[in-house]
């Protein structure tokens, strides 16, 4: 159930926070606590054959897409039993069997991967879709514009999901963006742009359902802006 998925994400993150705080996890962790409704509501509409790309704050996406919790935690600990044999760590968790193309330490690094995955799906004439999760800071990277433009031109089955937690590290969105909302940027690329309360699980689920079904039908990409906080 979606409730269990949200609980699994929060429980996973609380454990990650604890072990990081006592120095047992190498490197750094960016926790998804508080944003669980977005990954859960979106991924509830996906299958194992659908692809997602994630962010440096990506544990929640991987859990919601069906990633193995024990192997994920092993990866964060740098163990050879992890999904990436302990080589990727917190910011590079991937599981191709579940369609998880990877969390990404590069801000905005998932745009090209998701667009490419969607191009693959269209070329092979499948009804699989790709979903790109990204933060508000990534919306100001050049490849945001490039990939949304390509997705529109080629009518690709991809859904861009902006998790707008209002701050890119410590920079507020109003200070870094000329447009009042990220969703309205979709107009420039002739695709639907939808704004939703990212704390409302059922609202996110419904908006994502419409976007995913649109992509599966071959009607092209959608940009979703989910307002949340971390």
PLM region descriptions:
Residues 14, 24-154, 172-178, 183, ...:
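Cofactor-binding active-site loop characterized by glycine-rich and histidine/acidic residues
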Residues 4-20:
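N-terminal glycine-rich anion-binding loops that anchor highly charged ligand groups
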Residues 162-230:
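Thiamine diphosphate
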Residues 15-17, 130, 219-223:
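Flexible, glycine/charged-enriched surface loops at secondary-structure junctions
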Residues 133, 160-161:
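Residue-level marker for buried hydrophobic side chains located in beta-strands
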């Amino acid at each position: 159930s979606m409730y269990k998925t949200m609980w699994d994400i929060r429980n996973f993150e609380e454990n990650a926070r604890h072990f990081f705080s006592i120095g047992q996890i190498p490197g750094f962790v960016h926790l998804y606590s508080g944003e669980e409704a977005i990954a859960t509501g979106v991924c509830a509409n996906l299958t194992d054959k659908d692809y997602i790309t994630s962010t440096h704050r990506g544990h929640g996406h991987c859990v919601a897409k069906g990633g193995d919790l024990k192997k994920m935690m092993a990866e964060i600990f740098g163990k050879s039993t992890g999904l990436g044999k302990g080589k990727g760590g917190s910011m590079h968790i991937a599981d191709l069997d579940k369609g998880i193309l990877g969390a990404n330490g590069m801000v905005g690094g998932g745009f090209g991967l998701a667009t490419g995955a969607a191009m693959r799906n269209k070329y092979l004439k499948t009804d699989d879709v790709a979903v790109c999760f990204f933060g508000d800071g990534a919306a100001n990277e050049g490849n945001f514009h490039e990939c949304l433009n390509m997705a529109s031109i080629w009518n690709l089955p991809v859904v861009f999901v902006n998790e707008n937690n209002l701050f890119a590290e410590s920079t507020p969105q109003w200070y870094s963006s000329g447009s009042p909302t990220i969703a309205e940027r979709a107009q420039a690329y002739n695709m639907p742009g939808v704004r939703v309360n990212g704390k409302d699980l059922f609202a996110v689920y419904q908006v994502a359902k419409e976007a995913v079904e649109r992509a599966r039908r071959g009607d092209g990409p959608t940009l979703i802006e989910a307002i949340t906080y971390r």
